[in-house]
Amino acid sequence: MKIDVIPLGTASAVPTDERHLSALAVERKGQVLLFDCGEGTQYRLREAGLSWARIEAIFVTHLHGDHCYGLPGLLSTMELQQRADPVTLVLPPGGPAMLRAVPGATPARLSFPVHVVEADAAGTLGTVYETDEIAVEARRLDHREVFAMGFRVAERTRPGRFDPERARALGVPEGPAFGRLQNGCPVTTPDGTTVRPGQVLGPPRPGVVAAYVTDTRPCAGGRALAEEADLLYHDATFADDHAARADETGHSTARQAATVAREAGATRLLLGHLSARYPDPAPQEREARSVFPAAEVAEELRRYELDPREKEPDPVGPADES
């Protein structure tokens, strides 16, 4: 199932005429995961054609205002619009306390179910959200003394494609037996022969991976999240001319983001969290492409489509006999 990654806000610290405060949506099967929620995110969701009612989970990287001050308002809107479906909030240490300080946004007082996951201050992270089809992993980043985390959305590997012709050749009757094989269960043919899934299924099909790594120096956590990602959104606050400033403030340059993408084996790189000091981000894009050609400045409201069919292995026959 394809995934759309939609940058809603790609500015650093303050909005500009062209860029808005940090937020990024991942849409799959009409359901939305929201990463960061700076001021104005509700407007950006509307402009992107994304309904707040379809948000299943919200992930906040850290408690700097440009990444989280839109969250109380979004929760209040959900309350006012009589939301009934549950929502999961994955927050850094202190996140729940911040919401409790805002009337109308305290999770325990909202009329819809809210599941709060507060990251361990010691940085013990891992899988913070999962369904039958996807998992979201969090890792600690390096944003000076501020606790910050990045996220990796990964579809689960799916069984290989079912070969009905081979199943018939092995004596499997059409009907429920086909379904059992596709679900990974062996079946017995009318003549008593056991047919196993590996005899009629192609190689396993990997799902797509998107990583959100922002407000960080280059670090081990960010590289791990970016490992073989189909799409990596990475902090590129500064160009090379302010590399020292990037290190001082706990950010990355565009070239450093590209180096992370290259070393991690990512497929595509989106440069985000861009400083307002660069009205034209073309120099940052050029610097990144000199290291990693598949880099580009993130375009707000554009849908970056990730299709798992593009990753499917060639149908070279049954994967095994088990």
UniProtKB/Swiss-Prot annotation:
Where is this chain compositionally biased, Basic and acidic residues type? 300-314
| Cofactor(s) the protein needs | Zn(2+)
Residues recorded as binding Zn(2+) 1, renumbered to this chain, are H62, H64, H143, D215
Which residues act catalytically here? D66 (proton acceptor)
InterPro entries hit by this protein: Metallo-B-lactamas, RibonucZ/Hydroxyglut_hydro, RNase_Z/BN
Question: What keywords are assigned to this protein?
Answer: Endonuclease, Hydrolase, Metal-binding, Nuclease, tRNA processing, Zinc
Family membership noted in the UniProt record? Belongs to the RNase Z family.
- Job of this protein: Zinc phosphodiesterase, which displays some tRNA 3'-processing endonuclease activity. Probably involved in tRNA maturation, by removing a 3'-trailer from precursor tRNA.
Query: Under which name does UniProt file this protein?
Result: Ribonuclease Z
Q: Which organism is it from?
A: Salinibacter ruber (strain DSM 13855 / M31)
- Gene expressing this chain: rnz
